[in-house]
Amino acid sequence: MARIAGVDLPRNKRIEIALTYIYGIGLSRSKEILKKTNIDADIRCQNLNDQQIVSIREILESSYQIEGDLKRFESMSIKRLMEISTYRGRRHRLGLPLRGQRTRTNARTRRGGKKTVAGKKKAPRK
């Protein structure tokens, strides 16, 4: 089993797809990496030799931010937005949608489950 960037790649999948298991690598970036290393995209992960694995690893380390580095960069960006109190930072802090979506309805993913508020009660008759 090939282990690249701390991720065990699935043995029986094509290398083009297996690379997408690494955080920060999608299908287009996977194809780009394979083109740089001159590895056929149809090779199964279990059929890679050590030299091919090393070449993929070298390109990933030199050219791309992946896994922990990328996650750290994203969290630092969000913290920076919150510290300088931008609109997006305040929305992150409140746990609300950031990009202009409506919140009166349909914001359940960011806001969590429904919290029922009691309705207005009628005054008792005399």
Curated annotation (Swiss-Prot):
Alphabetized, the UniProt keywords read:
Chloroplast, Plastid, Ribonucleoprotein, Ribosomal protein, RNA-binding, rRNA-binding
Is Cell inner membrane a UniProt keyword of this protein?
no
**Any one GO molecular function term:** rRNA binding
Chief subcellular location equals plastid
One GO biological-process annotation of the entry reads:
translation
Which top-level group of life is the source organism from?
Eukaryota
Where are the annotated segments for Disordered? 97-126
Query: Where can this protein be found?
Result: Plastid, Chloroplast
Which Gene Ontology cellular component terms are annotated?
chloroplast; cytosol; small ribosomal subunit
Instruction: Show the coiled coil region(s).
Output: none
Q: Which HAMAP family match?
A: Ribosomal_uS13
Q: How does it assemble?
A: Part of the 30S ribosomal subunit.
Q: What is this protein called?
A: Small ribosomal subunit protein uS13c
What is the scientific name of the source organism? Porphyra purpurea
